[in-house]
Amino acid sequence: MFQIGEALMGQGSELAHVDLMIGDKGGPVGQAFANGLTQLSAGHTPLLSVIRPNLPPKPSTLIIPKVTVKNMDQAARIFGPAQSAVAKAVADSVEEGVIPKDQVEDLVIVASVFIHPEAQDYNKIYRYNYGATKLAIKRALEGFPDIDTVLEESNKSTHAIMGFKVTRLWDPPYLQIAFDNPNLEFVLSAISEIPKSDHVIIEAGTPLIKRYGTDVISKIRQVRPDAFIVADLKTLDTGNLEARMVADAAGDAIVVSALAPISTIDKLIEEAHKTGIYAVMDTLNQQDPISVLKQLKVMPDVIELHRGIDIEGTEHAWGNIGEIKKIAPKALVAVAGGVRLDKVPVALSQGADILVVGRAITNAKDVREMAEQFINSLNKPEIDQFRVMTDF
């Protein structure tokens, strides 16, 4: 057996975070147990868990402090409430049948325990570490989380200490608001008026990028830290370099023109994926986007069917969205140019995943009100809006 579990519990400086391994004495966990007990490290000295002095639990459990212990006050928090809490959690796990009683002499546990240097309340240290250890053991032996849970939750989750959410596009449809006005003061003011929504994307439009460069992404992020920000560079050359520039500026997606050489598009997509951002292919003025897609080594994450500002008054169809999705089934399809409120149902019915709207929102007398109308037209609830959340 070689099982791994993790759990976080509590709040404030007494917060407990436990990572543990449980496995056979003769296996890798047993080897780690023996190494930890015999190879001491200053500030991270391992110790056996005990319910009280002279009463260790079964399976035998080794505690390793995560945070460097610098003085005896800090040591007392480990050699005391945390040591006892971990041991009692192990014993109770056996009593409750989580750990099979007939295997306690065959197994060992190695638990890495976090104790904040400023933790003071021994009662909370005990209770939080007891709960976290017990939960980590249960999760380890149940194989929690399974891969389906990981994939479902990974796009919803925000790390509590990180303090901001990294948005991914997994729950379409979305409203992408394009800011082409090169007046930065106006753009930032308008962005601050946009309602917070899991289904809103912010686009730094081409004129804005041309005037301020990719540094404008950081300016936008100061106003909307959690936003998914698209940098509309309409790249035509040096695809890998421009993708890296957007990634370095903390953007979420870069736009490449479908008119660019195939090698440029390929390099941009490759670099975007390497750096963890999305690659968007804009089909503006490209008469045969299907042909372009068929020549690519890897599909872009988003394919934008686009007519330009200068031709929005002409008769237009967004093209065969269904055919594009057959060629690139995992890609999202965005529609841009002439998207107004009365066109939203049509675009969605044709299979559009992203509606790109510019002046219909950004030039409105009431930006917030108009944005709300578009958001409501998506008819999409917020992610986990009705979920009562603890850890899961």
Swiss-Prot record:
> Is the keyword Lyase assigned to this protein?
yes
GO biological process, any? carbohydrate biosynthetic process
Source organism of the structure? Methanosarcina mazei (strain ATCC BAA-159 / DSM 3647 / Goe1 / Go1 / JCM 11833 / OCM 88)
- The organism's superkingdom is given as Archaea
State the Gene3D superfamilies in the record: Aldolase class I (3.20.20.70), Formaldehyde-activating enzyme (3.30.230.60)
Q: State the family named in the UniProt similarity comment for this chain.
A: In the N-terminal section; belongs to the formaldehyde-activating enzyme family.
Q: What is this protein called?
A: Bifunctional enzyme Fae/Hps
- Recite the UniProt keywords alphabetically: Carbohydrate metabolism, Lyase, Multifunctional enzyme
Which pathway or pathways does this protein act in?
A: Carbohydrate biosynthesis; D-ribose 5-phosphate biosynthesis
Mind telling me which HAMAP family this protein's record contains? Fae_Hps
The residues the record assigns to binding substrate are: D19, L48, K66, T68, Q83
Under PANTHER family, the record lists: 3-KETO-L-GULONATE-6-PHOSPHATE DECARBOXYLASE SGBH-RELATED
Q: Which residues form the active site?
A: H17
* E.C. code: 4.2.1.147, 4.1.2.43
Q: Which GO terms describe its molecular function?
A: 3-dehydro-L-gulonate-6-phosphate decarboxylase activity; carbon-nitrogen lyase activity; hexulose-6-phosphate synthase activity; hydro-lyase activity; orotidine-5'-phosphate decarboxylase activity
